[in-house]
Amino acid sequence: MNEQRSKSLIQLFESISALERKVANEWNSRNVLGFSKSHIKILELLATEGPKRPSAIAEKLQVTTGGVTVLTTKLIKSGYIERTQNELDRRAAQITITTEGLKVLEISRSHIDSLTEGIFGNLTTEEIQMMHQLFLKCIK
């Protein structure tokens, strides 16, 4: 790898790290509900796709089932989701979002909209699409 490319990659890495910190700081400063992004992703998943088994949630979020247990425990204690037995297979637990969970999700969506607009609002639609494509290319 040539020296200029190496320098550019290091600068890119540092910029991505700075953006990560900015997103985390913005999330924390606006997070009046006290939930992580993963908690909100679970609520979003259940709201859009319906009840799920913990293993399906783990697969979608790309975390372990143990991680899902930790995340869902806080949401259950808060009354935002419920754990029920699957009617077809009594051995299988199923996670469902509650009415209160839907309300909290709406509040979170508003916070996320505000956060993303604050961070990316100065970009054009074309720049946002280009950035998205570049991130997807890096992930593959």
Question: What is each model feature region?
Answer:
Residues L33-H39, T98, G121-T124:
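Short helix-coil-helix linker/hinge
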Residues S6, Q11-L12, I16, I107-K140:
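Terminal interaction helix/tail motif
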Residues K41-E44, K103, M130:
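Pre-recognition alpha-helix immediately N-terminal to the DNA-recognition helix
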Residues E87-S108:
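Basic, amphipathic "hinge/linker" alpha-helix immediately C-terminal to the N-terminal HTH DNA-binding motif
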Residues G50-A93:
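Canonical helix-turn-helix DNA-binding module
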Residues M1-L33:
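N-terminal leader segment of winged-helix/HTH proteins
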Residues N25-T64:
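N-terminal helix-turn-helix DNA-binding core of bacterial DNA-binding proteins
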